[in-house]
Amino acid sequence: MSNENHEELNDQLIVRREKVDTLREEGIDPFGEKFIRSISPEEIETKFADKSKEDLEEAAIEVSVAGRIMTKRVKGKVGFTHIQDRFHQLQIYIRKDAIGEDAYAIFKLADLGDIIGIKGTIFRTNTGELSVKATEFTLLSKSLRPLPDKYHGLKDVEQRYRQRYLDLITNEESQNRFVMRSKILKYTRDYMDNQGFLEVETPVLHTIAGGAAAKPFITHHNALDMELYLRIALELHLKRLIVGGMDKVYEIGRVFRNEGTSTRHNPEFTMLESYAAYEDYEDVMDLVEGLVSTVCKQVNGTTKITYGEYDVDLTPNWRRIHMADAVKEYVGVDFWNVTSDEEAHELAKKHDVAVTEHMTYGHILNEFFETYVEEKLIQPTFVYGHPVEISPLAKKNKEDERFTDRFELFIVGREHANAFSELNDPIDQRERFEAQMKEREQGNDEAHGMDADFLEALEYGLPPTGGLGIGIDRLVMLLTDAPSIRDILLFPTMKHRD
């Protein structure tokens, strides 16, 4: 911003504050009281769209409306303004002799961005525009700062994220996207409820960071003098509830991971996790397919959508493929016939797949998949059969114990869900926790810790269970064609300004 523009902005701020002082000197509160609205600009548009000028004159319908001033022009004793409420604008016609000299003086002091209340009658102008002829004018809130770019929106993308309130005032697409987010959450809950799941709440503060491979945020409880972790997953507490006999449960809540940010990652984000007793990962595939396709149809009116450059068909009967088969199909490497960790390391070197010393067969297969396959899965695809090394909470596959009964859902090259037949053998679970702790000692700081209380719960008996995790934010991105996770979080995490 140039010095001249900076001074101009300061001048505007000063003038608006001077107007506040002027109003107060006249005994007028610039930040008014409750105002009862009888109708919104949107309702006027829809209810009276087919009414003629003569119809409205004869009916003389009195209304009470409120909104933010977006345009204003005054000529002598007559003025026009457009007020906005949720991106529906309504023209207000104001005459000095109709609202009185004092009220008209206040109107003349009004600036773009001020919030006003109007009482009057609906009419149609000679050009056919639905309007309200004011009989009363009330200032409800004085705007001390001018709206950006003459209310045409914020040009600076980062400013949109930092000052979301301005983005919502000036960007209809952004506001609509957040309305859709709320609907997606509602329809998701409706679907889960209709499938017989019970919504529950579990702790945000954990004594052990478990349920996912991620770095936690650490805090300290002063009274108990103990370290606690903001949860990185919902899983382990929900599975305790299955042990307790709550057969089908789900939770939608915030989780926290002390990791980097990107167009797909925010340190705090919203997860849906669900667990159903006596089911397996194939049942969960059916649940996910039904949930995503149903919610998509409810918010978009169709299961065929566009995301960026891709046309995506979410109609059920999605593709299902084993991870080893996917690597064989897309890369030409057959991991079914790899018999040792050494052979896997040689393949990684040959195909330029980055690996570390502690990685074994399963880690390397997964690295091949993430390097060469994941981004190619545009249409909804369930990839199942994840290696046991990267799935410490999933049940081993009976036919080949190198793999687990686990799947991830990929759409437009991104993971959208993670699910498995839950490991319910407490002895096997303890061994896997121990293996994870060895990985941590070897430098994998995202490996799971030992959760003794969870192991004790498993020892009382966890029935066969199908578990699911869906990233709500990525689902919202997909269904609203949002390029960045910051576009669908009202207040994304941002680095401090210098």
UniProtKB/Swiss-Prot annotation:
Protein name: Lysine--tRNA ligase
Coiled-coil regions, chain positions: none
Enzyme class: ligase
Subunit relationships: Homodimer.
GO molecular function: ATP binding; catalytic activity, acting on a protein; lysine-tRNA ligase activity; magnesium ion binding; transferase activity; tRNA binding
Cofactor note: Binds 3 Mg(2+) ions per subunit.
HAMAP family associated with the record: Lys_tRNA_synth_class2 (MF_00252)
CDD domains: LysRS_core, LysRS_N
Any one annotated GO CC term: cytosol
Lineage: Bacteria, Bacillati, Bacillota, Bacilli, Bacillales
Annotated residues for binding of Mg(2+) 2: E415
